Amino acid sequence: MKHLISMKDIGKEEILEILDEARKMEELLNTKRPLKLLEGKILATVFYEPSTRTRLSFETAMKRLGGEVITMTDLKSSSVAKGESLIDTIRVISGYADIIVLRHPSEGAARLASEYSQVPIINAGDGSNQHPTQTLLDLYTIMREIGRIDGIKIAFVGDLKYGRTVHSLVYALSLFENVEMYFVSPKELRLPKDIIEDLKAKNIKFYEKESLDDLDDDIDVLYVTRIQKERFPDPNEYEKVKGSYKIKREYVEGKKFIIMHPLPRVDEIDYDVDDLPQAKYFKQSFYGIPVRMAILKKLIEDNEGE
């Protein structure tokens, strides 16, 4: 694997290989022993958009592996403020680091960067397009908490139009056997047509709903997303749909599903849900560390000597 840009670039076997490696990384983390698996290697985190969990978990993952981190997050103090292009920025930084994690507001930015980089590029989100490392940690969470991915029933709730985590995960789940998907959203925020057409072509069972009350009782995973205000071209459209769904304690109690959320949370899950056994979103966030350790290790090892 040269880069990790989109879930469409990797198959089911490679996904399972990464998940297996992540389990080993989690076990190594639990020993509390310092690791030297990537000693002498440097990760560059290049973020053109805000991030807390993704950037910090990648930086933590690299340091846990014994590597070092350089970072570019304050665009005002970088050459980007002077008008430097993404291509030139990547060309320069790829001479400093062994691997780059990139987040950019433009769809296709990570793919473009990979064409000019001397080192592996990991896409940490390109607009509303893809977020493959979030998808891999989501799959890992499902595997760890449910015990399987094949045969699950999962409901996606909220912003399905602009939610890049949803787009990536839906595609990845379509590679597994007998997965059923439910899409709960306002009409304005339904899943993009190209993704729907892909599911139809693969004969994946899916159902579009507008109410949580329409979901079956045997759902395994409730995947909740925030309404992404920053993606709306018209603020008035955001006002129409904000707060469309709120997961309340009384709705969750007694249910068999686990609740996942890519975070940050705004108001779509009440805080008093957090202590219920179904709430797995903070554990999901933690799982990002062993998963990203596995990704960093694989990409650097796969590209050594090329």
From Swiss-Prot:
PROSITE patterns: CARBAMOYLTRANSFERASE
Catalysed reaction equations from the record: carbamoyl phosphate + L-aspartate = N-carbamoyl-L-aspartate + phosphate + H(+)
Amino-acid biosynthesis is among the record's keywords: no
UniProt binding sites for L-aspartate: K82, R164, R226
Pfam families: OTCace (PF00185), OTCace_N (PF02729)
Biological process per Gene Ontology, one example term: 'de novo' pyrimidine nucleobase biosynthetic process
GO function terms (MF aspect): amino acid binding; aspartate carbamoyltransferase activity
Residue numbers binding carbamoyl phosphate: R53, T54, R103, H131, Q134, L263, P264
EC number: 2.1.3.2
Alphabetically ordered keywords of this record: Pyrimidine biosynthesis, Transferase
Involved pathway(s): Pyrimidine metabolism; UMP biosynthesis via de novo pathway; (S)-dihydroorotate from bicarbonate: step 2/3
Main EC class the enzyme belongs to: transferase
GO cellular component: cytoplasm
Family per record: Belongs to the aspartate/ornithine carbamoyltransferase superfamily. ATCase family.
HAMAP family for the chain: Asp_carb_tr (MF_00001)
Function: Catalyzes the condensation of carbamoyl phosphate and aspartate to form carbamoyl aspartate and inorganic phosphate, the committed step in the de novo pyrimidine nucleotide biosynthesis pathway.
Oligomer status and interactors: Heterododecamer (2C3:3R2) of six catalytic PyrB chains organized as two trimers (C3), and six regulatory PyrI chains organized as three dimers (R2).
Protein name: Aspartate carbamoyltransferase catalytic subunit
Protein's organism: Methanocaldococcus jannaschii (strain ATCC 43067 / DSM 2661 / JAL-1 / JCM 10045 / NBRC 100440)
Name of the coding gene: pyrB
